[in-house]
Structures are given as C-alpha cells and as structure tokens.
C-alpha cells in the first residue's frame, strides 16, 4: 500500500508539471505570432476565439487530423520513434527544476549534471529523424544540428561550471539559495560573461533564430523534419518550444535567483512584495527569457553556418575559460557579497 501511495503521488506531481508545461508550449506559439506581429506592425492571429486565444487549439486539431505519411524508402521504426526521442528529454529535464522552494519532483544532488545530460540528449531525436527519412535535405539539416549542439554544449557546460564554482553545489535548490537576496545578490552580476555565453549557447542549442541553420528554409527545405507531417511534425514542434522554456527556466535558476524576489531585502519594496509567491517570480523570469527568444527572431537575420561555428569555438569557449580563471580569483579573495 505504501508503494502504491508513493507511486500515486509521484504520478500526480509529474502530471501537475507536464500538463501546465504542455499548455505553456501551446500558448508560446500563440505568443510568438502575436509578439512578432506587433514588432512588424501587424496584428497576428485574432480570429479563432477572443483575440485569437483558441488559435493553438485549432492548430493542434489541424495537425492531429492530418495523415502521417512515411516515405517509401524510410526506416519506418526509427522514423516513428524519432519525434518521441526529441521531446522526452525536454520534459524529463523538468524533474529536477524547483519552480518554488521545495517544489521539485526530484531533489537530487547532481541536478546540474542531469540538466546538461538531458539538454544534450535531445539531438539524438534530430539525428535519427534526418537519417531515417532517407532524404538528402533532412540529412544535411541533421549534420548541421548535431555539429551545432556539440559546439555550443561545450561553451554552455563551461558557463554552468562557473555557477557550480560560485554556489559550491550541483543541487539546483542550493544554487538558488546561494543567491538569496535581491537582484544584486544573484549570479548574473559576478558571472555576467558566463551568463551571456550560456544564453547565446542556449539559443543555438535550441536551433532558434539567428542560429536556425538546421531548418534553413531557403537552403535545405526546412531541414531534418522535411518529411514529417501531422502528429509527428507536431511533436517536433512541441519539442522545440519545450526546449525553449527549459533553457529559459534554467537561466532563471542559475543566474536570476530562481524563486527569489528581485526586491528581497530592500527596505521599502521588499516588505511590500513579500506576499508574492516564489513560483510567480520564477514564472516571470522564465517569461522574460522566452520573450528574448521571440525578440531575437524578429530582430536578427540568420547567421551563415561558418559564422556560427566560428562564434562557438573561437569566441564563446575562450571567453568562458578566461572568466573561470577570473572567478577563481574572486572566490579565493572573497570578492563581493557572492563568495
């Protein structure tokens, strides 16, 4: 009976996290179209429901009702399971992310390592999709995506090593507690170069603009999912947006104090805003980074493939190595309120 009760509570916690996450993914697509529409001086979707609020549901129904066509020369088994391999790591990574104090499915001491592992596993779904499709365009998109993830995973890993050094722990809850205080106590300030490297690497890892060469419509006809349609295409679509939310949430945890208020400890604003739950601050910080994704897409043109590789290997990795040395000096000398 005790085992059944434990399994029931674990399942309940997973559902309480996955269902809102899937809703957030669906409405992020709506937000993207509205925000980019506003930036381009147009309205965006506004016909389905009030102000277009039912547009994601209409899009989902359209994709579900479409036929899933499998190319005649494709590897059928791998072709079908590739979308699942793309979305599962994006959802599984949320198991260790504390959305508020004590609100995590699994509070493990190697949470940071687990996050790095999950973010790098998603590329296997892309690789398998490109190879199983038996299409030269899909294969080219796969090669680009895998090289890009390998290049930027190193820079992202080094950036998160800086967080590990500053917090002295790989437990995400303890990393947030090490940033207890207002906005100037968070790690974004002493780790500013690492923060910027992490964010640029995160955008590149999710294959979003301006690093979306894996889906270069003008070059390789939408890249690795060119042969997918219907529900299987929708799953790839969900995986991309779920990864965007994941990278944004990890940025909020690692550099922006997680559930802490930016005014925590301030003489006047601090007590006035103490009533706001930590989960609200966490969601606001995550939403800020998701808005940055949309802002980048509306602002920057797509980089050339060689420019992306040069940025990853010749700029971001050297910056992280240099700042890790500077951070070591900060820690040894006890610089500022962070160490």
Curated annotation (Swiss-Prot):
Q: What HAMAP family does the record tag this protein with?
A: NDH1_NuoH
- Molecular function terms in GO for this entry? NADH dehydrogenase activity; oxidoreductase activity, acting on NAD(P)H, quinone or similar compound as acceptor; quinone binding
Family annotation (Pfam families): NADHdh (PF00146)
Known partners and oligomeric status? NDH-1 is composed of 14 different subunits. Subunits NuoA, H, J, K, L, M, N constitute the membrane sector of the complex.
Q: Where in the cell is it found?
A: Cell inner membrane
Classify the protein's membrane topology as the record does: Multi-pass membrane protein
Q: What class of enzyme is it?
A: translocase
EC annotation from Swiss-Prot or TrEMBL: 7.1.1.-
Is the keyword Cell membrane in the record? yes
Give the source species.
Answer: Alkalilimnicola ehrlichii (strain ATCC BAA-1101 / DSM 17681 / MLHE-1)
Q: Using the chain's own numbering, where are the disulfide bonds?
A: none
Q: Name one GO cellular component term.
A: plasma membrane
Its protein name is NADH-quinone oxidoreductase subunit H
| Role according to the record | NDH-1 shuttles electrons from NADH, via FMN and iron-sulfur (Fe-S) centers, to quinones in the respiratory chain. The immediate electron acceptor for the enzyme in this species is believed to be ubiquinone. Couples the redox reaction to proton translocation (for every two electrons transferred, four hydrogen ions are translocated across the cytoplasmic membrane), and thus conserves the redox energy in a proton gradient. This subunit may bind ubiquinone.
The record's comment on protein family reads: Belongs to the complex I subunit 1 family.
Entry keywords, A to Z: Cell inner membrane, Cell membrane, Membrane, NAD, Quinone, Translocase, Transmembrane, Transmembrane helix, Ubiquinone
List the catalysed reactions.
a quinone + NADH + 5 H(+)(in) = a quinol + NAD(+) + 4 H(+)(out)
Transmembrane portions of the chain:
7-27, 77-97, 112-132, 149-169, 180-200, 235-255, 276-296, 315-335
Query: What domain of life does the native source organism fall in?
Result: Bacteria
Q: Name one GO biological process term.
A: aerobic respiration
Q: Gene behind this chain?
A: nuoH
């Amino acid at each position: 009976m005790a085992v059944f009760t434990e399994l029931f509570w674990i399942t309940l916690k997973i559902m309480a996290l996955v269902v809102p996450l899937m809703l957030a993914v669906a409405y992020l697509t709506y937000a993207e179209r509205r925000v980019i529409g506003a930036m381009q001086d147009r309205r965006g979707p506004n016909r389905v429901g009030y102000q277009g609020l039912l547009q994601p549901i209409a899009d989902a129904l359209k994709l579900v009702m479409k036929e899933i066509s499998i190319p005649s020369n494709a590897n059928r088994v791998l072709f079908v399971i590739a979308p699942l391999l793309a979305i599962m790591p994006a959802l599984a990574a949320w198991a260790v992310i504390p959305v508020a104090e004590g609100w995590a499915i699994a509070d493990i001491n190697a949470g940071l390592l687990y996050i790095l592992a999950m973010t790098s596993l998603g590329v296997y779904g892309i690789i398998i999709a490109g190879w199983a499709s038996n299409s030269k365009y899909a294969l080219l998109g796969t090669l680009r995506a895998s090289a890009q993830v390998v290049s930027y995973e190193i820079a992202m890993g080094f950036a998160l090593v800086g967080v590990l050094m500053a917090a002295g722990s790989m437990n995400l809850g303890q990393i947030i507690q090490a940033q207890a205080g207002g906005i100037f106590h968070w790690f974004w300030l002493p780790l500013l170069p690492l923060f910027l490297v992490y964010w640029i690497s995160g955008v590149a890892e999710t294959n979003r603009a301006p690093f979306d060469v894996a889906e270069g419509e003008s070059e390789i006809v939408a890249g690795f999912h060119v042969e997918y349609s219907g529900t299987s295409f929708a799953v790839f679509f969900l995986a991309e947006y779920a990864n965007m939310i994941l990278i944004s949430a990890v940025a909020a945890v690692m550099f922006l104090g997680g559930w802490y208020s930016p005014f925590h400890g301030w003489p006047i604003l601090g007590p006035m805003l103490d009533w706001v739950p930590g989960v609200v601050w966490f969601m606001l910080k995550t939403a800020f980074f998701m808005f940055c994704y949309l802002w980048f897409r509306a602002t920057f043109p797509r980089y050339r493939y060689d420019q992306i590789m040069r940025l990853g290997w010749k700029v971001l990795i050297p910056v992280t190595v240099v700042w890790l040395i500077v951070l070591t000096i900060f820690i040894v000398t006890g610089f500022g309120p962070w160490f």
